[in-house]
Amino acid sequence: MLGVESMNVDFKDFTNQLFFQTVFAQRFLIGAGAEYKHIKIKSNTAPGINPVFDDSDYASAFGYLKFDSLDDKYFPTEGYYFSGEAKAFLYSSDYTGQFSPFTLVKGEIGTAKTLFKGFTLNFQGETGMSFGENVVPTFNFVLGGYGYYATNNFRHFYGYDFMSLGGNSYIKGLISADYEFYRRHHLNLSANYANVGNNLYEEGKMLSLPQYSGYALGYGFETILGPLEIKHSWSPETNKHFTWVSVGFWF
C-alpha cells in the first residue's frame, strides 16, 4: 500500500484500567470496567507520508467472560478454554480525525486432548469484529508472527511475518499436535487458517474458504523461567519461510 515491502514501526501503548470481576457458578470469571488508553504509532521509514499514524487518547467501557480448565498455558494436555470480550470506545482526542464511537467484540475457544502418553492434540478458534461507522485503523485486528504477548488486537499467525494481515474483522482456526518425547521437551506440528479483512460478517465472507494459511514445525523446552521455543513456519500463498525464537513467559 505504501510501496515498500517492510518498514520499522514504533508502537507505544499506555493503558490504565479500573474493573471489577467475580467468579460465576464457580467456573466462569466475569468482569466489567472502564479503560483509558494512549496510543502513539510512528514510522521513520514510511516514505512520503506523515510519520505519525496515531497519537490519541481513547476512553472505553468493557465487559468479559472467561473459562479456563487447561492444565498448562503453553503446553496443555487436557482441558477447555473460552474467552469473550466486548469493548465500546466512547471518546477519543482523535489525532487522525477519523474517530466516531464504535464497538469491538472478540472471542476465543480452545481444547486440548491427550490421545496417548506424551501425544496431545490442541484445537483453537478465534474471531473478532467491529461495529460502527468509522472504526479507527489503530484497532484493526492484525495477524502475523509468533512469540510476543498478544496485546490489543495483535494475534499470532504462522506463515506470515509480524503485522502482515489486517482488517476490522477476522476468523482464525488452529490445530496443533504436540509430542513430549522426553520430560519437558516437546516437538510440535501446527497448521492455522484465517480470513481477514473489512466487514467480513456483513459481506458473508466469514465462513468462506480460508484466504490465508500457514504451517509450523517447532521445538519447546519447559524451564523455570518459562518456555524456550523455536518455530519454523511456511505459507503456501507466499512461499516465504520464517523462524522465530521465544524465550520465557509472555507478559
PLM regions and their residue ranges:
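Outer-membrane beta-barrel translocator domains and adjoining extracellular loop/strand segments
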Residues: 1-3, 42-49, 76-78, 92-102, ...
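A generic structural micro-feature
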Residues: 10, 55, 76, 99, ...
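Sequence/structural signature of outer-membrane beta-barrel proteins
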Residues: 37-43, 68-72, 87-95, 112, ...
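Transmembrane beta-barrel strands of outer-membrane/channel proteins
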Residues: 1-2, 32-38, 80-90, 107, ...
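Outer-envelope beta-barrel architecture signal
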Residues: 26-30, 57-59, 76-82, 117-123, ...
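C-terminal outer-membrane beta-barrel translocator/porin domains of Gram-negative envelope proteins
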Residues: 61-66, 70-182
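Gram-negative/organellar outer-membrane beta-barrel architecture
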Residues: 1-64, 70, 146-155, 163-170, ...
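C-terminal hydrophobic structural anchor segments
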Residues: 178-212
